[in-house]
Amino acid sequence: MSVCVRIAPSPTGNLHIGTARTAVFNWLYARRHGGRFILRIEDTDRDRSLPRYTRNILAGLAWLGLDWDEGPVYQSKRIERYQAVVQQLLDRGLAYRCYVSEAELEEMRAAQKAAGKAPRYDNRHRFLTEAQRRAYEAEGRQPVIRFKIEEPLEVSWVDLIRGPITWNTQDLGGDMVIARADGCPLYNLAVVVDDIDMGITHVIRGEDHIGNTPKQILLYRALGHEPPQFAHSPLILNPEGKKLSKRDGATSVAEFQQLGFLPEALKNYLALLSWSPPDGEELFSLEKAAALFDFDRVNRAAARFDWDKLNWINSQYIKRLSPPELVERLTPFWQAAGFDLSEVPDPTWLEDVARLIADGIDRLAEAPPLSRFLFQEPLSYTLPALEQLRLPGVAEAMAAMATTLAAAELPQVSADSLKPLVDQVAKGQNMKKGLLMKSLRAALTGDLQGPDLLESFALLQRRGWALGRLEAVQKLVPC
């Protein structure tokens, strides 16, 4: 059997991180077995489905590198196909028109709740006569279409993650609506028809869909098809074990992209949410994971989103990038911060900046604040930096550093060539090396913390800004 799986997001919102994890699992399983990975857009909700969400979903999957083999297939373009199946079920007596109003349904649910029963449709219109149907239509009622669910009946399947599962049809809420009054199909019917037509062999999705599975199995059987195999992955919760929400930070793939996570790092982390490779490795490409992916190693327990671990994984991927690659990734973030990248002193300067800050960032979005002093002139100072520069003897030491730097004939500006000059000034000013270095950082970067000082000094000198910043200290010190 040739494996065929699908990811089927609904464009009623941006691509959610949970949907992305489901896409990763489907992609891994398809690649592991040499199968097909189909993208389907479930856009039958006319009120909530929006083109901008569709664009966001497609862009998010593409950014993650989850290439699909077929699609995108849009449900909105298959309405006639669904309506034909609904008519087939009506003709065979497996479905019927239901004229119960929303007010009557609410009254029914209220009575059931008052009696301590679970709310359900009581199938009251399953056996309407033709005269009764005409009477309801004369009132102007528009019927929905309900699929007949036999009760009592046990529906069982062996979930590839959770093992054997059995549902009694008495717990399914009565005959289910499969089409609205306007003819638009509902979720359970549309996905079953699609999965049949697309030859889906494995449905891999979140555990929140377990309750839909028995209904869909009944529809498969009614349409004369064997159901596919099902695998329901655990939900992703926040660190406190509650449903992941916007209060916990980013929840959409686009937000993670804006925060500066690399797609390869985010894919790596998503694969580790509920799954682990046999060798226990935590850093791997999705291609390597595909060779190892198996449902036996998917944990049934809910996964907790761990920001610290994601940040660590991302930092490791950043460190693996070559300087030119890192510059390419950082450029949009620098540009968004308003940095002018066209006026750099030499072709390798940006690469050296990237090399300097690579160890100090977990996310690309952290780069602009860390490297701002290298791109913006005049320099702005933090209050602690100003206090440092106003300490006794510091202004004189900065003036001496400026004089020494101006007189030096450096064959090549580097941290190694600047170090002797710093040592010379420390000795000449009778100043402890630590105090001088701290003061130099304040003068050159406007802060007391940051990347390697001598490397920063060299980059500023190559740009022609170091001398001016040392001389500017005199203006910061009260007379």
Curated annotation (Swiss-Prot):
Family annotation (Pfam families): Anticodon_2 (PF19269), tRNA-synt_1c (PF00749)
Motif ('HIGH' region): 9-19
Record-level GO cellular component terms: cytosol
Enzyme type, top EC level: ligase
Any one of the GO BP annotations: glutamyl-tRNA aminoacylation
InterPro entries cross-referenced by the UniProt entry: aa-tRNA-synth_I_cd-bd, aa-tRNA-synth_I_codon-bd_sub2, aa-tRNA-synth_I_CS, aa_tRNA-synth_I_cd-bd_sf, Glu-tRNA-ligase_bac/mito, Glu-tRNA-synth_I_codon-bd_sub1, Glu/Gln-tRNA-synth, Glu/Gln-tRNA-synth_Ib_cat-dom
Keyword list, A-Z: Aminoacyl-tRNA synthetase, ATP-binding, Cytoplasm, Ligase, Nucleotide-binding, Protein biosynthesis
CDD domains for the chain: GluRS_core (cd00808)
Annotated motif 'KMSKS' region, positions: 243-247
Any one GO molecular-function label of the UniProt entry: zinc ion binding
PANTHER family, sorted: GLUTAMATE--TRNA LIGASE (PTHR43311), GLUTAMATE--TRNA LIGASE, MITOCHONDRIAL-RELATED (PTHR43311:SF2)
Protein family (similarity comment): Belongs to the class-I aminoacyl-tRNA synthetase family. Glutamate--tRNA ligase type 1 subfamily.
Record-given protein name: Glutamate--tRNA ligase
